[in-house]
């Protein structure tokens, strides 16, 4: 596979054994530069609308980078300046799922993407 023309998106599931809180994300994706990707994060074990959802990412060998937050109850969002205009965070409360869409992808967007409560 020609990695110079594709962008790899990895996502991870976060769980808490004590409270059975789970955030289960969609699987890995490979996208071409300029494309968009939409990552899902399905919550269970708590009231989805009671806690903000944050999205962060981590590129290989780098630290965590905060992308933004969303209030699942109101739908209000706040995005890191770096991603303004490229990121959109939404939710579907009926299925307790949050979404993060990133557009105009570039090679630097290759990372593991996490949702966090």
From Swiss-Prot:
Q: Does the keyword Disulfide bond apply?
A: yes
Q: Which domain of life is it from?
A: Eukaryota
Query: What are the boundaries of the region Complementarity-determining-3?
Result: 116-117
What sequence ranges are listed for the domain Ig-like?
20-117
Q: Which residues are glycosylated?
A: 92
Q: Which PROSITE patterns match?
A: IG_LIKE
Q: Which Gene3D superfamilies match?
A: Immunoglobulins
Q: Where is this region: Framework-3?
A: 78-115
Annotated region (Framework-2), positions in chain: 53-69
Disulfide connectivity?
Answer: 41-115
Tell me the leader sequence span.
1-19
Framework-1 as annotated region, ranges:
20-44
GO BP term (any one)? immunoglobulin mediated immune response
Complementarity-determining-2: where is this region? 70-77
Under the heading SMART domains, the entry gives: IGv
Tell me where in or outside the cell this protein is found.
Answer: Secreted; Cell membrane
A GO CC annotation recorded here is: immunoglobulin complex
Xref: InterPro entries: Ig-like_dom, Ig-like_dom_sf, Ig-like_fold, Ig_V-set, IgHV
Known partners and oligomeric status: Immunoglobulins are composed of two identical heavy chains and two identical light chains; disulfide-linked.
Name under which the protein is recorded: Immunoglobulin heavy variable 1-8
Q: Which organism is it from?
A: Homo sapiens (Human)
Per the record, the gene is IGHV1-8
């Amino acid at each position: 596979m020609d990695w110079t023309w594709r962008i790899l998106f990895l996502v991870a599931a976060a769980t808490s054994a004590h409270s059975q809180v789970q955030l289960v994300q969609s699987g890995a994706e490979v996208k071409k530069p300029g494309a968009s990707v939409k990552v899902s994060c399905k919550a269970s074990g708590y009231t989805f609308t009671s806690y903000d959802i944050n999205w962060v990412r981590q590129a290989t060998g780098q630290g965590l980078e905060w992308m933004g937050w969303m209030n699942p109850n109101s739908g209000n969002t706040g995005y890191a300046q770096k991603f303004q205009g490229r990121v959109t965070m939404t939710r579907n409360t009926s299925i307790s799922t949050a979404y993060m869409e990133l557009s105009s992808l570039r090679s630097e967007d290759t990372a593991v993407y996490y949702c966090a409560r």
